[in-house]
Amino acid sequence: MATKAVNPETQRVKLERKERAILDAARAVFVEHGFDGARVSEIARRAHIGEGTIYSYYESKAELMLAVLQQFWDGLTREAEAVMASTRTERFYDRLQALGQYHLNILIVNADFINLSFALRRNNSEVSVSRDHLRQYVAVFDRLFLRGQDRGELRRDAVLWQARDIFYGSLEYSGRSIEMTLDADHKMREQEPVVDQIVALFRSHYGAVDGSGGTDSSTFDQLSQKLDLLSDKIDTLSNQLS
């Protein structure tokens, strides 16, 4: 009697569905218990599969943690690229506004997991997400910034990595500050003004100046003052978090 053939496509879909269930359960357990406190048996229970099945996908808990981290950052990259693709205008500052709003919201909604991933990066190189995945994510900003320079909207002498650090660094600390107010008695800080201020900062410092491609001393003074204020806010927030 002939054996009924298994549709390879159906089998692949089942395997992918099972892997997604493992990764979703693993992320929840890692956030709740941290990497060291997480147990593979608990992940298996939440994914409704046997513990041995997890090891057929991932050789160790560390490998599973890496897969969760990579899935997360790769997903963010795809979403950020989709935000850029859906932003109809080509104007740099409008697109920067859209990317800033997306990134700030992601930081707040996923605060627990992002904090875990940064802690692992500092303390556990075995399960730290690779720089390649982070580079792919921030490359969305890099392409936007370089295109702004090509279009003549931004200064030609602007340093990309400095602009990138200001953009993501400011949003990171603002996101933490906003997230800290979610369960507090006082009103939660609004997201939109934060992004508006960052866009205004980029406009005042990085905006192209007709005929020079540079900027005057007053613009540098304004940027210096704004960065000093940002530094003070970061110091205050760091003290609150410590």
Residue map of PLM features:
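Hydrophobic alpha-helical connector segments
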Residues: 67, 81-109, 167
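Helix-turn-helix
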Residues: 21, 29-63, 67
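Short coil/turn segments at alpha/beta junctions that flank glycine-rich nucleotide-binding fingerprints
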Residues: 32-36, 110, 151
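C-terminal peripheral helix-coil segments that are non-catalytic and often amphipathic
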Residues: 1-4, 139, 143-151, 176, ...
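Short, structured helix-loop boundary elements
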Residues: 12, 19-20, 40, 62, ...
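Amphipathic alpha-helical segments used for helix-helix packing
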Residues: 106-126, 142, 176-180, 214
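Generic hydrophobic, amphipathic alpha-helix propensity
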Residues: 18-26, 43, 68-72, 76, ...
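Amphipathic alpha-helical packing segments from all-alpha helical-bundle domains
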Residues: 77, 105-106, 125-153, 161-176, ...
